[in-house]
Amino acid sequence: MNIPLTPLRFLRYPEQQFPRKTALVCGDKRFSYAEFGARVGQLAGVLRSLGVQTEDRVAFRSTNCHRLLEAYYGVLEAGGVLLPLNIRLSPQELAYVLNDAGVTTLFLESAFLPLAEAFRNSVSLIKNFVLLDGPPQTSWLMPQNYDDLLSAATPLRRDLMAVEENSLAELFYASGTSANPKGVMLTHRNLHLHALSVALAMKSSHETIELHTIPLFHANGWGAAHLITFLGGTHVMIHRFDPAEVFRHPTPYLALDCE
């Protein structure tokens, strides 16, 4: 029997084995593995209700937050391909990436709405705009925001035995220092094996608490979005890494009670 390799397996295990353990911390929000998994299933249900089909590109323009981490599993559960967007790209670069990747659904934080206005009319394939935070923006075809959609969603989880491990799972764009940004394609198998190899090299364990200082859109966050879940550790998300702020008030990060 061939068992497909996919990072979706990483979340299923801690959901079942230690559902009450803290999986994710973001500001004053904490989610157990059971709650994390439930939100992932709700996101997958939202995407399917929006018409996302197998290998449709779903982009997130977001700083590090719990919603972006949920996308690393929810988009794949829906059969889509996740594209975390570099928040430092110009409107022209963003329009190029969105069109080149064929993105059909875009999630974005409210802070990026003014910038997004500059490329909105330059993208042709996007059918769905979803606001990650803040009040709904009807002028942007966003009658509901992310959490509203999740609360009304019918949860969806994939049959992992039906996953094609060599199918595309995530898509990242390099900076394009000499030309336009170039897409980097990662399969389910790529992501699964990378997490396993890094876990062995770093000698990490279920006690690991990862402060995500690297943006998840940068080099896939060095794989930490999947590595920590695979270990059954705890993700700690901060929107922007400010060294002075972290070391001025280190207690929330260094003394987390995550059990």
Model-inferred region functions:
Residues 19, 136, 151-173, 180, ...:
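Conserved pre-ATP/AMP-binding loop-to-beta segment of ANL
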Residues 63, 108-117, 214, 239-242, ...:
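Adenylate-forming
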Residues 32-34, 169-193:
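Conserved AMP-binding A3 loop
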Residues 3, 20-65, 69-73, 90-95, ...:
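Conserved AMP-binding/adenylate-forming core of the ANL superfamily
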Residues 192-209, 217-257:
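Conserved AMP-binding/adenylation subdomain of ANL enzymes
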Residues 49-50, 77-148:
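Structural core segment of the AMP-binding/adenylate-forming
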Residues 44, 57, 63-83, 87-91, ...:
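A short helix-loop-beta submotif of the ANL/AMP-binding
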Residues 58, 75, 106, 168, ...:
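Conserved S/T- and glycine-rich ATP-binding loop of Class I adenylate-forming
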